[in-house]
Amino acid sequence: MPADSFGVFHARRTLDLPAKPDRFTVHVSADNRYRLYVNGTQVSSGPQRSDVTHWRYETVDLAPQLHAGANVIAAVVWNWGRRHPVAQHSNRTGFLLQADSPREAAANTGTGWRLYRDSAYADLPVTNRDISGAYYAAAQGEAVDGARYPWGWERTDFVDRDWFTVPVADAGANVGQVHLHAAPGRGGYGDASGWQLEPRDIPPMEESLVRFASVRRTSGIAASDGFIKGGAALVVPANTRASILLDYAKTTNAYAVLETSGGAGSTITLTYAEAAVDSAGRKGNRNDVDRRTVRGIHDRFLPDGGERRRFQTLYWRSGRYVNVDIETGATPLRIEDLHGIFTAYPFVERGRFASDLPWLADMWKMNWNGARIGAFETYMDTPYYEQLQYIGDTRLQALISLYVSGDDRLMRQAITHFDDSRIPEGITASRYPSELRQLIPPFSLVYVAMVHDYHMHRDDSRYVRQYLPGIRGILDWYGRYVDSTGMLGPMPYWNFVDWADRWQRGVPAGADNGHSATISLLLAYALDRAAVLEADVGERAMAQSYRTRADSLRVATRTRAWDPARKLFRDSPDSAAYSQQTNVLAILSNALPQAEQRALMERVLADSTLIPASYYFSFYLLEALEKVGLGDRYIEQLAPWRGMLALGLTSAPEKPEPTRSDSHAWAAHPNYGLLATVLGVRPASRGFRTVRIAPKLGPLRSAEGRVPHPRGDIDVALTRDGANGLSARVTLPAGVAGRFEWNGRSVPLHAGRQDLHF
C-alpha cells in the first residue's frame, strides 16, 4: 500500500496456551497508529507520537488478559494517508509486535498473524466551511459503513479464515542500530532509513467515560437527557430527519462512542465544535445556542441493522458541543447510548490555590481544564485545530504542569523533541513533531529558557548537559547575525514574537530588515539563561562568553533603541513603534539598571499607546512585574481572564475576540502565576534545592495553596493582619530549606511546618 494512502487494517493472532502465564511481555508499535486487544479487551494504544528516526513502541504485559486455551491478540492499525495530521510522521503503514523473551515468541508479528483491510472506513476531509477558513492541521473525520465492518473482529469467537497471511515488510531496529538483519531487498549495510525504535517515555493516556451534561436543542424528534445518561434508548422512527445538539458543559477531548440497534439504511453524523456561531460566524457567549449553528469536523456512521452495534472513532475529537444529525431509512433506529471516552495526558491536580476572591477559583478551573486538554502525547497549542507542540506554547504549559501536577515527563518529552528538530544550521523547528517543517528562530531562544526552567525546578544536571550542544548551536547561529552595530541584523525565516495587533504576522519592527530591539533583547535573555546552565555544569569559560555577548547586546540596544524623551525602548532604532513586548524584554534581560526597571514597568502599564502584549506574551509581562517588585499588581492584570469567564469560556482562548481557538493553553499561565507570584513559591537555587517564598497578595486578604516539589509538597497558608501584617503557615518537604520574604523582611525556612508572623 502506498505510504500516502488512507487505510484501516485489523490483525489477529490466535495463541494456544497450556496455562495462564504469570507474565507475557511484548513490545508493540505501528505506523500511523494502533489499538491492541487481548480476548476483546483493549490493553494498549499508540504509539507515542514522534518521528521516524525516533519511532516509539509500547511495552505491555498481556498476562492479565490471557488464559489457558485459545487466546486472540488483535489490533486495529490505521494510516491517515496524505491527509494526515501535520504532527504525524510516517514511513509507511506497518505493525510490529515483538516478544520480550523466547517464551512469548509465538506472538511475534509474522506469518502466524492474519490481516484484513477494512473497506468500511473512509476519511471525511475537513473543509474551509467546516472551520470558517481557519488554519487546520489535525486529523480528518471518519465515515464507517456498518454493513462492511467485521463486527467482533477482536473477540475469540470471530472466524478469520478468509483473512490473508501477513507479509513481512521490514525489520525493526532500535535507535543506534542499523538493519544488519534486513528484510528482503534491504541492503543491511548501515541502512538506518526506516523506523528507528525507542521505548515510550511517557505513561499511557488517560481514558475515562465522559457523558454529555444536557440536550440543548432538538428538531424532528423529542429527546430527553435519558439516552445521554445511558439509562434509556432514543428511538428514531423510520423515514425521519432529526437533529440533536448535545453539550458537554465544558470543552473536552473524547473519542465518540455510539451504540445502535436496527436502523439499516440510516445515517448518523456527529459534528464537533467549541462554540455555536451566529449567521455571521461570531461566537458570542459560549453558553448560547439559540439561533446559532454548529460547524466543524464531523464523523459519519451508517448502521447495518444489527443489535448493539458499537461504533467508536479511531481518534479523539475536541470541543464542547456535538450536533447529532440523523436520517433514517425504511426501518426505525435505536440509539442505545451516545457518550465520549475522555482522553488526555494523565496529569493529576496536586497543586491548588484558594483565596477570598471567588472568581479566581473559577479561573483556576477554566485554566486547568485548558491545560489538561492541551496535553496528549505531546503538548498541543490547540486540541481542536492543530494539535501541534510549539516551543512558545510549550514553555508555559510545562511550567503549569510542574506547578500544578509536579509531573515533568511531558516536559522532558518536549525538550527532547525540540532538540531532535534542529536543522543543520543549528536552530530548532518552531514545533515538533511536525511532518511539515516550520522555522521561527525566536522560539529557539524560548527553548533555551525552557531548558533553564527545567534546570531550576529539577536537580538533574546529567539530563540538562546532553542538551547543551544543541543550545550552543542555537546561540552560535544567532551570533552569525549580530552586525557591526552590536544588534541583530536582518533575520531569516518567520521571526514571530507575539500575536500583536500592529505587528504583521506577529513580527516586530526590524526583525526582517535589521536591528530589532525586541529580538536582540530576547537573545540577551536567552544568553543569560544559557550562561547559568553552562556555569552549573562546570563550563565556566562558555558561561562567561555568553555573559559577555549578552552585555554587548544590552549596551548596543540601549544605545540605539532607547528613547530618552519617552523613557521607553523603541521596537527598533528606525521605528516609531513602541511595544509592551520590547520593554518587558528590556526588564527581563536587564537592559537597563535594576534601579530603573520598576519605573519602566510602571510606564509599560500606564501607557495605553504601547502595542499591547497578547494572552501569550502577558506571561512575560507578568514575570517582569514580579521581577521589579510590583507583584502586588498581578491580580489586577487578570481582568481579561475574568472576561473569559463572563463569555462562558471553559478553557482559555488563543486571543481576544474574535478568536479561532477556544482552547489554547498558552493562555492558562495564570495558574502558574497564582502559585509562583501571588503565593510566591519559586526556586531559590538550581534543582529547587532551596525555595524562596515571597507572596504578593495584592487585594487578597487570605490565600492558601500547594506546590508539588520533587521531594514532596510545599504548603503555604497566608492571612493578612491589618494593613501590613501577615500570618503565614509554611510546610516544606524533608531536605528542603529556604527563605520567606514579606515587606522587606526575610526569615529562614526549614523542612516541616513553621508558623510566621510579620
Q: What do the PLM-derived regions correspond to, one by one?
A:
Residues Y34, V43-S45, F418-D419, G470-G473, ...:
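Active/binding-pocket-proximal capping segment
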Residues A134-A147, E386, V404, Y447, ...:
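C-terminal capping/lid segments that line or modulate ligand- or cofactor-binding pockets
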Residues R103-T127, Y321, G329-M366, R372, ...:
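Active-site acid/base region of carbohydrate-active enzymes
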Residues Y255-E274, L314, V322-E327, I391-S421, ...:
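Alpha-helical support elements that line or immediately flank enzyme active sites
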Residues P125-G152, I221-A222, S279-A280, T548, ...:
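Non-catalytic C-terminal accessory modules of carbohydrate-active enzymes
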Residues M1-D381, D393, R409-L410, A429-P433, ...:
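Extracellular/oxidizing-compartment recognition motifs
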